[in-house]
Each structure stands twice: as C-alpha cells, then as structure tokens.
Amino acid sequence: TAWIETRTEEEMKIFSKIVKITHNIINEAFSSKVIKVGVTTTTDVEWWMRQKVTNIGLETWFQPSVDIQRNDEINQDHLRSFSNRPDKKVIQKGDLLHCDFGITYLRLNSDCQQMAYVMKDDDEQVPLFLQEAFKKGNQLQDVLTSNFVEGDSGNKILLNSLKQANEMGLRPSIYTHPLGSYGHSSGPTIGMWDAQSGVKGNGDYPLYKNTVYAIELNVTTYIEEWNRDIRIMLEEAGFYGE
C-alpha cells in the first residue's frame, strides 16, 4: 500500500464529520431558506455555499457549481463543459437541481454531488418518473461498489462495472477518483468522463484497503414526460477497507 492514499482510523472519524458537514450545507442550500423560486439564481446558491463554508471557518477546494435540468430546456446544459456552463439561471418550480461541492478540513477533502427537485404547486411528491430515474443512479452506485476488489486495477473495476450496468439496460458513465490529502488523491482512477474505455497509467493502479473514493458517476435516462434525456449525476464519499 501507499501511505498517501491510506486512511487511518482517526482520519476516518474526521472524514465522516467532513462528509456530514458537506451534506448539511447542501441540504440547507437546496432549501426554501436559501432558494426563493423565481428570484434566486444558480450563481446565488453557489456563492451562498461558498460563504457558508467561510462562515464556519473551513475552506472549499474548488468553486461550488449548481446547474438545472428542466422539461422545457432546449439546450441540454448537463452536456456542456463546466467552463461553458451558463450561469445566473433563475430557479423555477419543476426544476431539477444539481450541485458539485467539496470542503477541506485538516488536510482531508470531501467531494459530493447531489440533486434536488423544486416541487410545483400541484406536486404532492417528487414525480414518479424522477424517482425511477434516481433508482437507476442508485443501481449504478451499487454496481460500481460491488466491483471493488482488492488488487484489481481501476480499469478492471471500470470495465466490469460498465459491462454489468449495460447488461442491466442502464446508460452509465463512471469517473470515480480517490479522495484524501488532496482532492483527486493518489490511488486508482476508475474512469474519466472522456475515458470510458480505461485510463492509461492511473487506471492501471490497483485498489488497496483503507482508502477513500469519490463514487462519481451518472446515468442518462429518457424522460417521456419531458421529451428529453436527463442525467442523474451523483457523487458520494466511500470507504473501502476493514
């Protein structure tokens, strides 16, 4: 094993707290406390998250991002590069929100992507078609983590997971990376968004125990009610070890 990627028991106690803080900030950012429908923009939420982290004495290791998928969208913003992503979009009822957010504490880093639906006046719950789409995202998470085998390379884990997901009828994309002393830490790279056939070098590195990963991936699914594809984009910290 390599010492930079290996997490100690004490570090994992801290890591759990970092992830909990990250989730709590996202929950608040996506609540009516922060978002005023028809007024608040995606950029407003991004900077609220940044300021919240500063207020509690921590740091972000990258600028938070918030984007929207909606049923009347002509341009599929989730297919754009981050550098070409439109900003200051006003959040409306019926929007599907997505954020990418991570913080740093005691040299450890979180990296999280979560989504939220802005309910319309006649919604009693998240629409079933979105619930089904999220289930597909969760299925891919389960497929990927079930293929974590000590000693297997990142590329082997990637290809086994994609094969299994495709056989299940999913439209997967996996780009999972180690987390630790720096954001994209040392350890095996398990796919990149533009390298779904494997990553030369970093993807050849084996998986060791007592390591942490950003389980980062997405599933594309067609939403008949919106007459378009959407992506369920998820990222959660995961510990592989004893």
Give the positions of each predicted feature.
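Active-site neighborhoods and metal-handling regions in enzymes and metal-associated proteins
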Residues: 1-242
